[in-house]
Design a protein with these regions (language model features):
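Extended boundary segments
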Residues: 1-46
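Broad hydrophobic/π-residue packing in well-ordered secondary structure
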Residues: 2, 6-10, 52, 89, ...
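Short intrinsically disordered coil segments
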Residues: 22, 106-107
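Short, conserved turn/kink motifs that form compact alpha/beta structural patches or helix kinks used as
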Residues: 31-81
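Short, compact, well-ordered microdomains
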Residues: 68-106
Length: 107
């Protein structure tokens, strides 16, 4: 399946949950603290987690020349778009958390 993606990173590294795991950040997240730093298309993967792992490697090892953010890290958010809509994922310490439901109604 092909996915498009949007990477969000915290604007101000002094934000109290910057680079913190999901358990600490989940009640603090404010999407106004984030900037969309990169949009891409046509990442192929068998499932969302496989795509997120590919993106993590790409944006740490061999990021695109037009990428203006920092290496992908804990507290980054990636939105994956497919034919069924979109889902939001939080880069946690050791895995990815689907936070789509957690963000409903938040700004």
């Amino acid at each position: 399946m092909n996915y498009a993606y949007l990477i969000y990173q915290i604007k101000d590294m002094n934000t109290d949950y910057a680079f913190m795991g999901w358990n600490f950040a989940k009640d603090r997240i404010n999407l106004m603290d984030y900037d969309g730093v990169y949009y891409g298309r046509s990442i192929d993967g068998e499932n969302p987690i496989a795509v997120l792992e590919k993106l993590f490697e790409r944006f740490n090892v061999n990021h695109p020349d037009d990428f203006k953010g920092h290496s992908m890290s804990v507290s980054d958010i990636v939105v994956l778009f497919d034919d069924n809509g979109c889902k939001w994922y939080y880069c946690d310490r050791f895995d990815w958390k689907d936070i789509t439901a957690d963000l409903r109604g938040r700004r």
